[in-house]
Amino acid sequence: MSKQATLFDFSIKKNESKEQTNQESVEVPKQTANRTKIEWIKEAEDGKVYFLLQVDYDGKKSRAVCKLYDKEGKKIYIMQDESGHKPYFLTDIDPDKVNKITKVVRDPSFDHLELINKVDPYTGKKIRLTKIVVKDPLAVRRMRSSLPKAYEAHIKYYNNYVYDNGLIPGLIYKVNKGKLTQLNPELKGEEINEIKKAFADADEMTKETVNDWIPILETEVPDIKRVSLDIEVYTPNRGRIPDPERAEFPIISVALAGNDGSKIVLALKREDVNSDFSKKDGVQVEIFDSEKKLLARLFEIIREYPMLLTFNGDDFDIPYIYFRALRLNFSPEEVPLDVVSGEGKFLAGIHIDLYKFFFNRAVRIYAFEGKYSEYSLDAVATALLGISKVKLDTFISFLDIDKLIEYNLRDAEITLKLTTFNNNLVLKLMVLLARISKLGLEELTRTEVSTWIKNLYYWEHRKRNWLIPLKEEILVRSNQVKTAAVIKGKKYKGAVVIDPPAGVYFNVVVLDFASLYPSIIKNWNISYETIDIDECTKKVWVEDETGEKLHYVCMDKPGITAVITGLIRDFRVKVYKKKAKYSNISEEQRSLYDVVQRAMKVFINATYGVFGAENFPLYAPAVAESVTAIGRYIITTTYKQAEKLNLKVIYGDTDSLFLYNPTKDKLEELIKFVKQNFNLDLEVDKSYKYVAFSGLKKNYFGVYPDGKTEIKGMLAKKRNTPEFIKKEFAEIKNMLASLNSPNDIPEVKNKLEIKIKDIYNKLRNKGYNLDDLAFRIMLSKPLDSYTKNTPQHVKAGLQLRAFGVNVLPRDVIMFVKVKSKDGVKPIQLAKISEIDIEKYVETLRTTFEQILKAFGISWDEIVSTISIDSFFGSKK
């Protein structure tokens, strides 16, 4: 069941809260771990070839299990580890001393100790460590606190298994007696030469790594057989989302859409609605007089698919089906679904919750260029597919069967299409990201980019037999920072920003340093094990824009962060961005290359942010400070050079410069200067017809020659801005887009003043309805978990709960600002007469004042003239 733009689409009545009392006595079905009677997935055949989708841990058999996809048979299989691989962690204490730690050696899960050699990432020398081997992963968690130092003790077991065996999810493997052998694609000579040419000047460590990465980027991505699932549940009250764990209300419809062309709707026959339905081409509708029969049929269908897709299935569809099945007296062994640690599991394959994938900030911004700003199925599908959900004018429980089928099926179709549009772009993207991060598909799609990058670097450490250092050890070596932070909460000085003047500037060209921070990391060999290292013969100082020496970088050996970051950057820029534009290859191949470069863009752009985050395990303050310092030095030096060339820089931020009316030859000179002095690519990123600057940083309104606009930092673009402001801003945006020359400014200023006056008066006269005035904010966690302070949308949510509405995390709460103790009311409980006009006037001001300043218009002057006009108008 996908979420609408808001949970509360219909008004509620106070007496409906009575139902809340009734539901409290409902017993929650008990979950059980006894799932042994049915083997949902067959064993892989020896000698056959499969795609590795992910690795799990089977607690009953105490071994790793690989989930494998057979491209030809379109089925999923498992391969259980036969090598005897066990969980473990490391310590620098000798075995004889470890043997004296009773909490370790007397733990029932303790297995044995081993002496092993690892490579110190700082010195490159071998170090001796004790390997503590245990019988189950939970033992690592128990034991690690009993040792002064426990290395590699916070890694999930199945990821450890992947590292130790050098596995890469998403690649092709041959099964051989409980082991997997990687099979690489055969490339033509010219393809290999093209890649080698791109890395001709690289160090040996990078060249070796390039060879390992070719299969990651060149291996085909299978069109995995998959089916999307969406359920609809009867609820007696409007505005209520059923509790999945209670699962007290019947599932009235289940829609499935498969990439094999199947479209199936399973609906429950009910006496309270019209059960007639019209036949639709290609749609298989099955009506059931029993909900249990409906679910049995559902389980039969989904077992035929290796991959199950949902949108918000972790939080709703999967747990609701699972607990509802238990309530209907299915035994757990009959249900191919489970709920583990808040995740919906598909025991007959793998389950991808697309909501969590599209919710990922790095995916939204870097892979899809911010095309969607809200995360509901409707918002994402409208932005990426141009398709929306079926609009309803009544409550789902009141729909006749025919309309219910249409509504439910549309959701399932949209969910599937999110993985099939543009030649399976999203599926391919997920597989490529899995290959790069070395994460299985289920974990990849449920975690943030910081987890992806951490896993990639851990895998690369293990491949080189490097010890993964403790976070505390990294901080001891590189915790010293030399610059003071400008932004509160930061530990060091960040990027340089050249303050913009307030005003309108025509013919503005934006120059962008391509992948500035990743390029700095690569070109300056920056990595946690190369900064401020005593054991070094070749040191290069990092200087900031003032000339102060902050840190030194060791150039004796390539740093792992520099190697991996540079490799991904160069693969993208020098190889795959070009390949994605080749005309002499198939559309399918070109599509794959485009996905490859998109996937790498995600990693490139997220790298610095992750390594500069304090909660990242490889975080080194000196590394982050060095990167930003070099960035400031480059921007400042380039700015000074631009001035020497008589180029007028009107704004600069982090990795870009805005130039006013530059000449082509001077631009080329500046680009050449940057290449020669820093070995960086300075590119023309965009050209504006004009830019209106408010005078604030990261805050401007740009218009392109074709009339399209770009808004940066202005409140009207924010997701939770009231609808009336968005609508009025859109009209003003169209008005401003028509501005073609400085001569047009007086006329546009006059229109702008008149428009603002009209909006102001309409607001004062209560001409906007509650929907127009509503703020929309998503609830990120349960209402009761807000203990320190209570945000406005939470206050509104608490009011709704008092009226019997079940408010859950990820629900979008609509509220208005009113004159009351809380200052807000949910839209369902508010009246237009209660609206606090002054608060909305302030919101109006903070939104439009930014635009007004750019045109030299004073908000206070506009309001004062309105007041004077009103005064004299009342005298007539």
Swiss-Prot record:
PANTHER family linked: DNA POLYMERASE 1 (PTHR10322:SF20), DNA POLYMERASE CATALYTIC SUBUNIT (PTHR10322)
Chemical reaction(s) catalysed: DNA(n) + a 2'-deoxyribonucleoside 5'-triphosphate = DNA(n+1) + diphosphate
List the protein's name: DNA polymerase 1
Q: What is its EC number?
A: 2.7.7.7
A GO MF term: DNA-directed DNA polymerase activity
UniProt xrefs under CDD domains: DNA_polB_B1_exo (cd05783)
Name the family the entry cites.
Answer: Belongs to the DNA polymerase type-B family.
Say if the entry is tagged with keyword Amino-acid biosynthesis. no
Alphabetical GO biological process terms? DNA-templated DNA replication
| SUPFAM superfamilies registered for this protein in UniProt | DNA/RNA polymerases, Ribonuclease H-like
Question: Known InterPro entries for this protein?
Answer: DNA-dir_DNA_pol_B (IPR006172), DNA-dir_DNA_pol_B_CS (IPR017964), DNA-dir_DNA_pol_B_exonuc (IPR006133), DNA-dir_DNA_pol_B_multi_dom (IPR006134), DNA/RNA_pol_sf (IPR043502), DNA_pol_palm_dom_sf (IPR023211), DNA_pol_type-B (IPR050240), RNaseH-like_sf (IPR012337)
Question: One Pfam family this chain carries?
Answer: DNA_pol_B
Which function does this protein serve? This polymerase possesses two enzymatic activities: DNA synthesis (polymerase) and an exonucleolytic activity that degrades single-stranded DNA in the 3'- to 5'-direction.
Q: Could you tell me the keywords of this UniProt record?
A: DNA replication, DNA-binding, DNA-directed DNA polymerase, Exonuclease, Hydrolase, Nuclease, Nucleotidyltransferase, Transferase
Question: Using the chain's own numbering, where are the disulfide bonds?
Answer: none
